[in-house]
Swiss-Prot record:
Lineage of source species: Bacteria, Pseudomonadati, Chlorobiota, Chlorobiia, Chlorobiales
Domain of life of the native organism: Bacteria
Pfam families in the record: UPF0102
GO MF annotations in UniProt: nucleic acid binding
Residues spanning the signal sequence: none
Alphabetized CDD domains for the sequence: PoNe_Nuclease
Protein name (record): UPF0102 protein Cag_1992
Protein family according to the UniProt entry: Belongs to the UPF0102 family.
InterPro entries documented for this protein: Restrct_endonuc-II-like, tRNA_endonuc-like_dom_sf, UPF0102_YraN-like
Length: 129
């Protein structure tokens, strides 16, 4: 397996694969890499009338566990802050959820992901009231 030149490149490839997966599942991608201050949401998509804030984790090995394990409480807070900003600035009022997509990479060819599986965890975490 020829790994990509950086973890950022692996992340970009993983996000592109996750976006394609969501589109194939009928989601509409609204934003990629939405930033608010130092916080980022990888993908913002509509699943019917539900707005989904999606964190993508690409991994070269499944030894590290579930992608959900990589989304710490601190990372969840960052995503929630960015989501709140997005809702404020977009003026959208709708049902929302927070998903995590894991892209488990099985093979690479010339630093490109060539074989992978997707793990999609809907409602992976919630906003504490």
């Amino acid at each position: 397996m020829n790994p990509p030149n950086s973890t950022c490149e692996l992340g970009r490839q993983g996000e592109a694969l996750a976006a394609t997966y969501l589109q194939n599942e009928g989601y509409q991608i609204l934003e990629r890499n939405y930033r608010f201050r130092h916080n980022e949401i990888d993908l913002i998509a509509l699943d019917g009338s539900t707005l989904c804030f999606v964190e993508v984790k690409a991994r070269l090995s499944n030894k590290a566990g579930s992608p959900l394990d990589a989304v710490t409480v601190a990372k969840q807070r960052e995503i929630i802050r960015a989501a709140q900003a997005y809702l404020t600035f977009s003026g959208q009022e709708c049902d929302c959820r927070f998903d995590v997509i894991g892209v488990n990479v099985h093979a690479m060819h010339e630093a490109r992901i060539s074989s992978f599986t997707i793990e999609h965890i809907k409602d992976a975490f919630w906003v504490e009231q």
